[in-house]
């Protein structure tokens, strides 16, 4: 029995059909013996409280608009309290905002805020694979692999009781447009800039001598002089002597900030396996009050306890 949405319906209607299909399923465990897939044991963890259902609160923005109102705890990621769910789920809001796949919210919320039924309903493997195909390249651009907790082999095949792809098969309403490189999408507020600085290992004001294309990436090669380390982080002397930043998957997408290399740039990045990965780049504008404020007060900003996937994922600081 596959949970699938009515093609071409609006988001709420599609999920209503999905949940309607699931609600009639019997709750007795023996009636599920037909389905060959079984959820992996959750690390042998025992829960202090029995499963409960509660309203999805407004301050859980990742899932508050997912299309159903009640969620089950513990969830499918072993979170037992709503406070823990809120903290961990907030890390994924930026990924949702990137719109890397139309089913990102459905997939994530099936784990963080599973629909309230008598038995946990997992996402289908095909749903996981579809979202991973759309979002993993974006995450990799920032040096984050697809996380272990979301490995698709953990989820059931589509012939089992599971949540299938909802919106990924809808026809496109407009011709595809080449997206700006993820690292070149700009924040315009001081808070947004400081969030980016929080999630970056280093922040540098620099000039760019040249850009090279290599294996699908762009390489930004810094000029020898005119570098100012605003947040040195893990950068060593050898890193700064010849500063080379890798823009992952950046060879085939536009980056308006880099159309001209004249002037200085504000760059942010992470050091991963000895390589400097670009996370964000801005043209330096001394008249930009938001940028000046962010640079001046970056160390006063209350950074999240968790690194994000470009400003949110459950990687400890």
UniProtKB/Swiss-Prot annotation:
Keyword DNA-binding applies: no
Tissue specificity note: Highly expressed in the retinal pigment epithelium (RPE) and pancreas. Weak expression in heart, liver and muscle.
GO MF terms, alphabetically ordered: Wnt-protein binding
Keywords: Developmental protein, Differentiation, Disulfide bond, Secreted, Signal, Wnt signaling pathway
PROSITE patterns cross-referenced by the UniProt entry: FZ (PS50038), NTR (PS50189)
Major localization listed first in the record, in broad terms: secreted
Annotated ranges, domain NTR: 181-303
Keyword Disulfide bond carried by entry: yes
Similarity remark: Belongs to the secreted frizzled-related protein (sFRP) family.
PANTHER family, A to Z: FRIZZLED (PTHR11309), SECRETED FRIZZLED-RELATED PROTEIN 5 (PTHR11309:SF46)
Protein name, per record: Secreted frizzled-related protein 5
Organism, as annotated: Homo sapiens (Human)
Gene: SFRP5
């Amino acid at each position: 029995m596959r949970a699938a949405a009515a093609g071409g319906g609006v988001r709420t209607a599609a999920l209503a059909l999905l949940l309607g299909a699931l609600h009639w399923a019997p709750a007795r465990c023996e009636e599920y013996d037909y389905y060959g897939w079984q959820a992996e044991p959750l690390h042998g963890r025992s829960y202090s409280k029995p499963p409960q259902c509660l309203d999805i609160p407004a301050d859980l923005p990742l899932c508050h608009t997912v299309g159903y109102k009640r969620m089950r705890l513990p969830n499918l990621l072993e979170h037992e309290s709503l406070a823990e769910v809120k903290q961990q789920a907030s890390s994924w809001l930026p990924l949702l905002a990137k719109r890397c796949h139309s089913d990102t919210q459905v997939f994530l919320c099936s784990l963080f805020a599973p629909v309230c039924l008598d038995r946990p309903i997992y996402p289908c493997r095909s749903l996981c694979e579809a979202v991973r195909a759309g979002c993993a390249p974006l995450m990799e651009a920032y040096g984050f692999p697809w996380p272990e907790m979301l490995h698709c082999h953990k989820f059931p095949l589509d012939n089992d009781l599971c949540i299938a792809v909802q919106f990924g098969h809808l026809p496109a309403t407009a011709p595809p447009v080449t997206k700006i490189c993820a690292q070149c999408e700009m924040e315009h507020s001081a808070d947004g800039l400081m969030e980016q600085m929080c999630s970056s290992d280093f922040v540098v004001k620099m000039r760019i001598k040249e850009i090279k294309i290599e294996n699908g990436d762009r390489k930004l090669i810094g000029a020898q002089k005119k570098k100012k380390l605003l947040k040195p982080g893990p950068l060593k002397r050898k890193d700064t002597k010849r500063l080379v930043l890798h823009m992952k998957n950046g060879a085939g997408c536009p980056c308006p900030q880099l159309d001209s290399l004249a002037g200085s740039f504000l760059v942010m990045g992470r050091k991963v396996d000895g390589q400097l990965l670009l996370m964000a780049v801005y043209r330096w504008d001394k008249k930009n009050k938001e940028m000046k404020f962010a640079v001046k007060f970056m160390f006063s900003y209350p950074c999240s306890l968790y690194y994000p996937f470009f400003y949110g994922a459950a990687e400890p600081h």
